[in-house]
Curated annotation (Swiss-Prot):
Binding site for GMP: 99-103, 141-142
Tagged with keyword Cell inner membrane: yes
Binding site for Mg(2+): 96
InterPro entries listed in its UniProt record: PRibTrfase_dom, PRTase-like, Xanthine_Guanine_PRibTrfase
UniProt: xanthine binding residues: 99, 142
PANTHER family: XANTHINE PHOSPHORIBOSYLTRANSFERASE, XANTHINE-GUANINE PHOSPHORIBOSYLTRANSFERASE
GO MF term list: guanine phosphoribosyltransferase activity; hypoxanthine phosphoribosyltransferase activity; metal ion binding; xanthine phosphoribosyltransferase activity
One family name in Pfam for this protein: Pribosyltran
Provenance organism: Nitratidesulfovibrio vulgaris (strain ATCC 29579 / DSM 644 / CCUG 34227 / NCIMB 8303 / VKM B-1760 / Hildenborough) (Desulfovibrio vulgaris)
Name of the protein this chain belongs to: Xanthine-guanine phosphoribosyltransferase
Lineage summary: Bacteria, Pseudomonadati, Thermodesulfobacteriota, Desulfovibrionia, Desulfovibrionales
Length: 163
């Protein structure tokens, strides 16, 4: 399926919204702990993991690195670049999004005893996570703040006039 067919909507997330949503996720996770530490799925889980680590006073943060996206194209294979030892008992896994479930499924296989939490979840990925904050439709591209930037736009009065 092409990108144009797959994503019909865009959901832009600001830094402030991501922080609010990660903090809301922290509230949900607080009663489910304590945790030995956090395993952040890089790269998308790094920022939410930092917020959650602060809110839950967790000082041990590991990463698991899996490559699966090139802009809006999700590759068919997931490449594990870095993993962690064990089965995940007592650990909290954090990612930004459970989309098709490919990454979540792979991490679940590696760390079946961990608690898996994401800030956002789509219908296909939702069954693979234990805790999340916001569900987004499968045909929506979530535009995270690290994938965008604020740019200066020339005021209309200063733009060249079209005849």
């Amino acid at each position: 399926m092409s990108t144009a067919d797959r994503y019909r909507k865009v959901f832009p997330v600001t830094w402030e919204q991501l922080h609010r949503d990660a903090k809301a996720l922290s509230w949900r996770l607080l009663e489910k702990g304590p945790y030995k530490g956090i395993i952040a799925i890089a790269r998308g889980g790094l920022v939410p993991a930092a917020v959650i680590a602060r809110e839950l006073d967790i000082h041990l943060v590991e990463t698991i690195c899996i490559s699966s996206y090139q802009w809006q194209e999700q590759t068919s294979s997931h490449k594990v670049l870095k993993t962690v030892e064990g089965r995940g008992e007592g650990w909290l896994i954090i990612d930004d999004l459970a989309d098709t479930g490919g990454t979540a499924r792979l991490v679940r296989e590696m760390l079946p005893e961990a608690h898996f939490a994401t800030v956002y979840a789509k219908p296909a990925g939702r069954p693979l996570v234990d805790t999340f904050i916001t569900e987004v439709s499968q045909d929506t591209w979530i535009l995270f703040p690290w994938d965008s930037e604020v740019q200066y736009v020339v005021p209309l009065v200063n733009q060249p006039q079209q005849s």
